[in-house]
């Protein structure tokens, strides 16, 4: 009979029966009882009451029974730490058992019991197992060191286990070497500064020797370790590559990806003139192609990694286009990834083949896939200039199918083709206009409106077409409204006499009838431009547009280099560095590729050159979307660096003159408009303050930076509060506050002894918390604390402790021990102690980031009864590391744009509105934007605390 019988029982009150069976003299009965206990535990029943009875069964020679008891022990040791100590003697005994399987089982279980109380008892058995004669025991003990380090790092260091682990790298058994490497890598990742894996050519040679003999998972550990090594020159890099290359033909896809990672990294150091370099490129293609014949889930992971490889080195797979053609039974997520890679590999040589495929895909039934295929045709046109005409012809064929969603996607991509190749394909506009009535998606409607506005002089009835859109203006999405506003202003500047009523109608709708601040602001800007200087308006609105970038979705080069170092990990699937998604960022190391050799740089061909050319050599193109995302993802690497001032063109200067601070003087002027129309400037009261200026448009100079920002005077410190009253702590009273001085966080404590006995042996510990706060040093009370004595201590804190989200976010649970007892209390720390000194963001970056953070992440607050002017507020906030990036005055209202950064790299952007010189209005308005919205409430509380004290 199978073991399934143990899971079918529904008896009640069986704990007593099991207890009796566990204490039976018969071995078989005991084993049956333990199996029943494990079955109950597996289905979620609480059998912790049987702990002492199960532990008694450990004293057995039966390996199966011992395994079951150890399984039970691992599960319940944490909830029964006092009882778990009972098992220590058996562990010690089992670690000396003649059977290596039992020795290994004992040491494995020891590592899985995460109970502080018993860790010190396990050191001696572990030390013996690390030097055991049997390699199976040694390899198990190596992993146990990493587990023990996670529970008590200091203990592991004090006991010298790390040195023993390093010695195991030279072990004669390859599996021991692999496990030692895995354990050291794990420890090194959680303590990046420890320099545990101090690799040198000798140790690398040992690892490469072990690589050929250990299991597939052992090979992965060793390859990942090799990827962290920096060869001293290109000869050593080539030697390592030669010995790693055979792993490319391994059956396990994880081994293949780890080998690819090592080769991609070390190829950076090889000269392109070398014959070996070309050979290596050829060897990399077949294993990557083979990965695409695996099951869909593996294919997806492989494709996400190939996407990175193709961006870094397209020459590897340039002849393998066919393997990325979509199969009818591929899941949608595989299809979309394949499409993306097809576009990246598209070139003049294979474009005919690619277009034929894409046209075929556009007739499929899967709507999402069809949309992506149509977009892909447009991207091919932009990437391969010689194919543009063929692509436009293909898109027109698809429009003739009259399939609604195909038509709409085609119009969206044709807009981009017009941008890339001006005055070349405008003959198709008539065909596009025929489909105007069928457009119901915002993006397609916006694209069509852009085309009509941009080429209004070529379309006879452009005013009628735009007027038809204007009829339902308030029902349109914001995207369409903004595009319609701009298109009608363009039309007016091209045909002023015929469209006066139309432009006044749209400006009125945008500025007076709309609640959307972006739309309102753009309406006011156009209105003022037209009413003040029509010539400048023409220069701004009808300015020559920059070229559209060939690859709008290439990953930014520095981010790409970092992601190449993470091939085969979750980061390579997300296309984000670990610091962007690992909670708290603890132990996250930023990796980068080795520097290129001089010969490899000089030999780089134009086709394969990476996209990050120096700024002086780049054409004036729209920055790739990936660039901005890359910058935002890497904001936590250090303070934003201000670049040199940008040279503004005459058009940009015009925008600044029109809009920068001199708005009041414009309000009364009503010069002659274009075509004799008098534009009345809009009412002053309704002018909103908004940051919606495009980056680099000159509108960013609306910010009027003042030199009167306050100087540093030390972060605000709250008065001490009683955290633990004497009546709850047997006479020990603890008061305290938190401070931040010159980048160091401290907990300032006041300990008072209100008991009748002397207090000694003080220690302190924090529970895991949202920002990893932990004591950076022991609690030093140098002399015994006598009755009625008070002592003040400043305890330095670090932010590298364990992270766990607390409720509320700034909750800190503390345990204080002395010779009397252990006492627990919780307190709320002010968030401003986590505001770091390099939290001032560059103005351009501020604008880009503000726009990039979704509007739903914005939070609005009011700070009541705070009669401060802008200078005083800015000075107070700067002393607590809230930095003023820019200041504006709009209609008598001071606007401070501010940035701050938390210790875990989260940026918070703020807009603070102040009414200066108005004693009746002392309320300040605060808008906060952040990628982690749950932080906003606590940042607001910090603002209120700092400004009111």
Swiss-Prot record:
Compositionally biased spans, kind Low complexity: 594-611
Tissue note: Widely expressed.
Positions carrying N6-acetyllysine: 318
GO biological process assignments: basolateral protein secretion; determination of left/right symmetry; heart development; intracellular protein transport; kidney development; melanosome assembly; platelet dense granule organization; vesicle-mediated transport
Cellular compartment(s): Golgi apparatus; Cytoplasmic vesicle, Clathrin-coated vesicle membrane
Region (Disordered): 584-625
Function (record text): Subunit of clathrin-associated adaptor protein complex 1 that plays a role in protein sorting in the late-Golgi/trans-Golgi network (TGN) and/or endosomes. The AP complexes mediate both the recruitment of clathrin to membranes and the recognition of sorting signals within the cytosolic tails of transmembrane cargo molecules.
Disease / disorder: Keratitis-ichthyosis-deafness syndrome, autosomal recessive: An autosomal recessive form of keratitis-ichthyosis-deafness syndrome, a disease characterized by the association of hyperkeratotic skin lesions with vascularizing keratitis and profound sensorineural hearing loss. KIDAR patients manifest ichthyosis, failure to thrive and developmental delay in childhood, thrombocytopenia, photophobia, and progressive hearing loss. Low plasma copper and ceruloplasmin levels have been reported in some patients.
Record-given protein name: AP-1 complex subunit beta-1
Source species of the chain: Homo sapiens (Human)
Gene: AP1B1
